[in-house]
Amino acid sequence: MSQMDRTMQFNFPEDDQRANTRETLITVYQALEEKGYQPINQIVGYLLSGDPAYIPRHNDARNLIRKIERDELLEELVKSYLNDRRED
């Protein structure tokens, strides 16, 4: 079979995307802590409502989190949670 007959596959760089999402969540969490907020409550508020006012501008957290779709953030959180549960 020649190279021309083979089906090429394209895979998104999922590891890079996951790492970026994870780094963003950690940065946002730290910014919320530094400002004296309850990070989990604020992130949940943002995820449920889509209102960026739940996230402070401190350390550019608001702009960072808005660059990632909320469904991608939820996907990463669920994957991380389930992976941790499997290891228990």
Swiss-Prot record:
Transmembrane segments: none annotated. It comes from the Bacteria. InterPro entries: IreB. Belongs to the UPF0297 family. PANTHER family: UPF0297 PROTEIN YRZL. This is UPF0297 protein EAT1b_2723. It comes from Exiguobacterium sp. (strain ATCC BAA-1283 / AT1b).
